Amino acid sequence: MSSSNEPPRKTDQPSSSSASASASPSLFLSLPLEIISMILARVPKRYYPILCSVSKNMRSLVRSPEIHKARSLLGKDYLYIGFIDENYRPVYDYWYTLRRIENSTTENLFESIEFPYPSEPNRFSMNAVGPKIFFISESCTPSSRLSIFDTRFGELRQGPCLLVKRGYNCVGLVGGKVYVIGGYQDDEIAAESFDLNTQTWEAAPIPDEKESHRWICKANVSFDRKVCALRSREGMTCYDTRDGSCQRSEMPNDQWSRVGLCVIDNVLFVYFSRFGLMWYDSKLMLWRVVYGFDLDNARSVGIGEYYGKLAFIWEKPSLNVSESKEIWCRMIGLLRSEVGIHGAAEPSQLVEIVPNGYRMCHCLSLSG
């Protein structure tokens, strides 16, 4: 998401790695923009929040269109979109990926893919961590198992077990760590974190929210160094990973789905049935409408970050193929100004025709 108050500078910005960028940003920022863009495009996106904290100029660069264009040419970002077919029992999952065609900055490919699941029959939360998907138990049967699927190589492996068995919980990625809150017994560790570098679990700050049911959520997201549990009626509860403090806020009285929300440049976006696309102003603790375009009251919507834009995916009945429906996609550019966030919608694209029984259940943003 770009900002009208902080345009990227053509020269004067970061170094050939995230470490050197932090150590001597002025030297890095003096390089030509084209070189800076290609360097930063190769840095894993989970380090971008760290780079953004170096300086305002660095933050503008990391969020600039030039970086997203460079990442696009490298094919760094992609979406994993999952459907379940409700016409059959047991229910089966069908997965597709949306990714850029090689050496293109605009054309996308939507194709069916094989997707392995952990053998344990529990229900799992699925969380995108760079190019990997973390499976953590999310059911009434507590489990300490962690499974990790690497989308680059199609490999599913077992990760280190959690410190305690957990049932329903809230999961989020903040600052190089995966946090798990809730789903514990009274005498157990209330929250823990998994360090992506050391590959180890450790106890995290104890949440001051004493009601453990607050972490039984419809969806979870991470922004502002917080992990947030979203519930339809109870609103949003956010856990601050720095000190365990928790904050509650209301959500609009409208319908939304767990696939219809995402975070872009540290801003939470949710698509509501009546209100449309909205964003959460964390400073004012208000929900605000994204203006500037019309989504025609789309239903069964999934959204995700895709090269700095919001990928908007929805279903509608097929007029040409009986007992089928169409999957459509359009990209929405986001511009933040002093008055709010405006969206610029690109042309819609029909990407697939699927059976009527398919229902979108996952929309994961992954990155290399």
Curated annotation (Swiss-Prot):
Alphabetic keyword roster: Kelch repeat
CDD domains xrefs: F-box_AtAFR-like
SUPFAM superfamilies xref list: F-box domain (SSF81383), Kelch motif (SSF117281)
Region (Disordered): 1-23
Biased composition (Low complexity): 14-23
Pfam families documented for this protein: F-box, Kelch_FKB95
Claim: Cell membrane is one of the keywords in the record: no
Domain of life where this protein originates: Eukaryota
Start and end residues of each F-box domain: 25-71
InterPro entries attached to this UniProt entry: F-box-like_dom_sf, F-box/kelch-repeat_ARATH, F-box_dom, Kelch-typ_b-propeller
Kelch repeats: 177-221
Full protein name: F-box/kelch-repeat protein At2g44700
Lineage of origin: Eukaryota, Viridiplantae, Streptophyta, Embryophyta, Tracheophyta
